[in-house]
């Protein structure tokens, strides 16, 4: 099975760490966070993994190479340009990066999973994909329920009684939140999703594609699952991830 890891961001919220280290390479006890994701994907049968890279792309590619030593096949899609022999990164947005890959070579030919490269998770991906297929979904967001007093730190997903996504709220106040289900940056798609992503421009999953799917009334679902998830996008979250690994 095939998957994609989003690894092109600059990691501005974790500076100064990311001035010299791309976010997916931030170490959790001397092991890059992306390595945990590769191991999770392999465990659930995802052995062909595409990684979009941009900021400090060489750091990621030189460490993981073709993925053979991790038991998977890794390929890379660079976003940016080459000037005077140097790579200059310019990310295309999460959906734009996916589309660039598919336009160049139709890599995604069946149900596939997309993970953000800066989170530590222990999700049962097999069960998540099964739910996606049972719903006949074009796109699925894996959600996690959080206490109501924590919603203002996350992107909230609003669904109907059948799980169909109806709206999003970005870090709403406790009083304004219409849901306690949050977007974990874990997505499942069918290849037909590329019909709704334009080519050659910056296009984001959360900011562009998902609102478009809601407006269209597409079979776009959210599934709430119980799993450990730590986004290392902020320094306090990074230390939480380290403590989590130490405690097993």
Identify what each model region corresponds to.
Residues 2-5, 13, 27-115, 125-127, ...:
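Conserved N-terminal catalytic core of the sugar/cofactor nucleotidyltransferase
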Residues 10, 117-119:
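Active-site metal-binding loops of divalent metal-dependent hydrolases
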Residues 16-19:
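Conserved catalytic-core motifs of eukaryotic protein kinase domains, centered on the activation segment
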Residues 25, 156-159, 222:
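A structural signal for short hydrophobic beta-strand segments in well-ordered beta-sheet cores
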Residues 111-113, 120, 126-133, 146-149, ...:
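Catalytic-core segments of class I nucleotidyltransferases/pyrophosphorylases
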Residues 135-145:
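A short, conserved acidic/glycine-rich loop-to-beta-strand motif
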């Amino acid at each position: 099975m095939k998957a994609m890891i989003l690894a092109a961001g600059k990691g501005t919220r974790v500076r100064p760490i990311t001035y010299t280290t791309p976010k997916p390479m931030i170490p959790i006890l001397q092991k890059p966070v992306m390595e945990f994701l590769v191991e999770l994907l392999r465990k659930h049968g995802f052995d062909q993994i595409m990684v979009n890279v941009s900021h400090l792309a060489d750091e990621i590619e030189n460490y993981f190479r073709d993925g053979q030593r991790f038991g998977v096949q890794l390929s890379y899609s660079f976003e940016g340009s080459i000037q005077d022999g140097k790579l200059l990164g310019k990310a295309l947005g999460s959906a734009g990066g996916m589309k660039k890959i598919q336009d160049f070579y139709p890599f995604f030919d069946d149900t596939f999973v997309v993970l953000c490269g800066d989170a530590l998770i222990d999700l049962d991906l097999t069960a998540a994909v099964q739910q996606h297929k049972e719903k006949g979904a074009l796109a699925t967001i894996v959600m996690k329920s959080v206490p109501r007093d924590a919603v203002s730190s996350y992107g909230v997903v609003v669904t109907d009684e059948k799980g169909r996504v109806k709206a999003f709220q970005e870090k709403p106040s406790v009083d304004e939140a219409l849901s306690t289900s949050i977007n974990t940056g874990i997505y499942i798609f069918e290849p037909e999703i590329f019909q709704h992503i334009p080519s050659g421009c910056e296009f984001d999953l959360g900011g562009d594609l998902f609102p478009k799917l809601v407006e269209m009334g597409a079979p776009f679902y959210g599934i709430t699952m119980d799993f450990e998830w730590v986004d290392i996008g902020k320094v306090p979250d990074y230390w939480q991830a380290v403590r989590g690994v130490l405690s097993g």
